[in-house]
A protein has these predicted regions:
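Acidic/His- and Gly-rich active-site-bordering loop/insert found
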Residues: 22-126, 131, 135-156
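Divalent metal-coordination and catalytic microenvironments
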Residues: 46, 87, 98, 130, ...
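Zn-dependent metallopeptidase/amidohydrolase metal-coordination segment
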Residues: 345-427, 445-475
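Bacterial N-terminal signal peptides
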Residues: 8-18
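Acidic/histidine-rich catalytic neighborhood of metal-dependent amide-processing enzymes
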Residues: 132-202
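Midchain, well-structured core segments that form catalytic/ion-binding scaffolds
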Residues: 182-340, 344, 350-352
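Bacterial N-terminal signal peptides that target proteins for export
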Residues: 1-9
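His/Asp/Glu-rich mid-to-C-terminal helical/loop segments that flank catalytic regions of hydrolases
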Residues: 231-234, 238, 242, 246, ...
Length: 476
């Protein structure tokens, strides 16, 4: 299918301007296809490294090297984050940003096998597909650069290397630093078990580590001298669980105990819990948070301990932009879904057997989901970007249908050719979307008008993590 055919899907409906002859004949998708080997190579390398948030040194270095080889100008170490960067190519015209996440998750790893197969000595894995995210976004940015260059279209394409999405809120610090203020539109994508460009928002969230200190003592010889920090954690957890009953239906809260002592016969003088609170809007998070802090204070008072807490991260919900989402949906439909080879289908069938009732027909990978508005129950720091500039995203079937994020099945597919195929599809959709935005001023204006109306005339950006500095050691 020629670029002109793909473009016609949206050109009539969305404030189209006549295209220059060269933009009609140069197909941006071909620029993605020309990079297929590089896309898979980078995705696999990042999958092998599986670097954690704010520690993505090799991953970010590789991405910057690839951009530099394509004559992008690189600014590294931005927003006081050593692994964050912006690569830019072009001049004048609109500024279109493409976001690239790269961090892995701790505590889960897996080979690319279709059965459970942890890798000995490896303590992290790409269970959210950010190796694919990075590779696909890098490919799209380079494809857009080549298209701009060949067509002589004015404008700048930027790739934002955004670390620590998984609980580190890297994009929040980048937003707070004003790095998106001159961007016309930001484009992102994510690994998934389906293909969709629906206008899907997310939950606002905040996390913190609650640290209790007490007095150590012999648990049998002198228990009366001890003040158990673990008692403080447990008392707080009990009150938090009671709080669940009085939270709104669409809110949620979860926690883990990260430190609880080392020996049963020693009263622990230190204990720590790690909490997340989520709600569809930031004010809802704040209301629950006040009560959670009260639970922490009450637990300390009742157990004779002390407590302090550190906010680790916080994200605003995604501000959807329907004007952009409808166009992205049309681009995705013009491309179609993910087609498996016989070998890939056999591998996917084995994965599907491990999913139980969550399994879905393998043919779903080749389909495009319906367009509409929906609420996703996860959270992402893309939300803060979406309050700085109009933002649009897409999801593609990089995982076997029915696979959930943060599972070993997601790790396996993210290191498999199925994941690479979904990445290619995402790169093509983003490239088509960016090309449309560069030449369609009417679409850019419509997106900005919707964005301004959604934020409101008196909007002032507020970060849910406050004024803290990036927690560069939160994964150490």
């Amino acid at each position: 299918m020629k670029f002109t055919a793909r473009f016609a899907v949206t050109c009539v409906a969305v404030f189209a301007a006549p295209l220059a002859a060269q933009t009609e004949t140069i197909d941006p998708v071909a620029e993605v296809e020309a990079q297929e080997e590089r896309t898979s190579r980078i995705a696999q390398q990042l999958w092998d490294w599986a670097e954690l948030g704010y520690l993505e040194t090799r991953s970010t270095g590789l991405m910057q090297e690839e951009l530099a080889s394509e004559s992008f100008t690189i600014k590294a170490g931005i927003a006081d984050i050593p692994t964050a960067f912006v690569g830019e190519w072009g001049e004048g015209g609109p500024v279109i940003a493409i976001l690239a996440e790269m961090d892995a998750l701790p505590g889960i790893n897996q080979s690319a096998s279709a059965s459970r197969d942890p890798v000995a000595g490896k303590h992290a894995g790409h269970a959210c597909g950010h190796n694919l995210f990075a590779a696909g976004s890098l490919t799209a940015a380079i494809a857009v650069k080549r298209w701009l260059e060949k067509t002589g279209t004015p404008g700048r394409v930027r790739l934002y290397g955004t670390p620590a999405e998984e609980g580190g809120s890297g994009k929040v610090y980048m937003t707070r630093a004003g790095l998106f203020e001159d961007v016309d539109v930001a484009i992102h994508w994510h690994a998934a078990d389906r293909n969709s460009a629906a206008a899907r928002t997310t939950l606002a969230n905040r996390s913190a580590k609650f640290r209790f200190t007490g007095v150590s003592a012999h648990a049998a010889g002198a228990p009366e001298r001890g003040r158990s920090a673990l008692d403080g954690v447990e008392a707080m957890n009990m009150m938090a669980n009671m709080l669940h009953e009085h939270m709104p239906q669409d809110a949620c809260m979860h926690y883990v105990v990260t430190s609880g002592g080392t020996a049963p016969n020693v009263v622990p003088d230190f204990a720590e819990s790690f909490y997340y609170v989520r709600h569809p809007n930031p004010d809802g998070v704040d209301e629950i948070w006040v009560r959670l802090e009260a639970a922490a204070k009450g637990a300390a008072q009742g157990t004779g301990t002390q407590v302090e807490w550190e906010v680790i991260h916080g994200n605003n919900p995604l501000l959807v932009n329907t004007s952009l989402a409808r166009v992205m949906d049309a681009k995705l439909r013009s491309l179609g879904g993910v087609k498996y080879t016989a070998e890939e289908r056999a591998w996917a069938a084995e994965i599907s057997k491990t999913l139980g009732k969550a399994a879905k027909p393998l043919d779903d990978a080749a389909k495009i989901g319906p367009f509409g508005k929906s609420l996703g129950y996860g959270s992402t720091d893309v939300g803060d970007v979406s309050y700085a500039t109009p933002t649009v995203g897409v999801r593609t079937a990089t995982w076997v249908p029915g696979t959930s994020a943060h599972t070993w099945q997601a790790v396996a597919a993210s290191g498999h050719s199925i994941g690479h195929k979904g990445t290619q599809l995402a790169a093509k959709a983003m490239t088509l979307m960016a090309a449309e935005l560069f030449i369609n001023e009417g679409l850019r204006k419509a997106a900005r008008a919707e964005f301004d109306a959604a934020r409101g005339p008196d909007y002032k950006y507020k970060s849910l993590l406050g004024d803290r500095e990036p927690p560069l050691d939160y994964r150490k």
